[in-house]
Amino acid sequence: MLGANGAGKSTLLRVLSGLEEPDSGSVFIGGLAFRDHAVEIRRNLGVLPEALGLFESLTIIENLMAVGPIYGLTKSETAARAADLLGLLDLRQGRHTVARNCSFGMRKKTALAMALLHNPKVLLLDEPFEGIDPASSAVIEMLLGQLSSDGATILLTSHILSVVQKIATRVVILHQGRVESDFNPSTTDEGVEEVYFSIVGRPQPEVPDWLRS
């Protein structure tokens, strides 16, 4: 999902993940209505929220160990999967750092690891590439590609149009709270950037004189 700040991307993700009730209509995931099957759906749902959702007083590894039992993982299963994810996301060295003391990039990678821990069938990711170093971004791209190949459904938001052009099989562009475009970038002559700016407009900024001196 693409769109300018305030277009409604994060709100839509919160509705899809059950964190907010829709004003009308229903959310179905895997053919099940969220309001009737919330517990079952959440077991197969991985969410990277805008606010990240970390336990601020816990370390990185403690955050991962805390969510494992929620998804029915044993302590040993959680520890093994956490070790794999910490290695992949370059978090092993900082695994004993308290979340509130971590950099933004470390915090986001921790939240992503928490979302991936139970190998969910559906992933709802709010800006997984933003604020991430290039090496980790490449790993995340590889991970999401592998999960998609294995049958996972991944819905993510991003402002990095080049990444979206590279990985997306479907692009939805939101503008002022409405879906303005829904297309497969591989079947259109226009690139993602061209379609995006044709909808939201390409800015023509003028730098004020006082910033020039």
PLM segments and residue spans:
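Catalytic Walker B motif of ABC-type/P-loop ATPase nucleotide-binding domains
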Residues: 123-126
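Conserved catalytic motifs of ABC-family nucleotide-binding domains
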Residues: 119
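Conserved ABC transporter NBD signature motif
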Residues: 25-33, 41, 181-183
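Helix-to-loop junction immediately C-terminal to a conserved catalytic motif
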Residues: 17
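Conserved ABC ATPase "signature" region
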Residues: 65, 69, 76-94
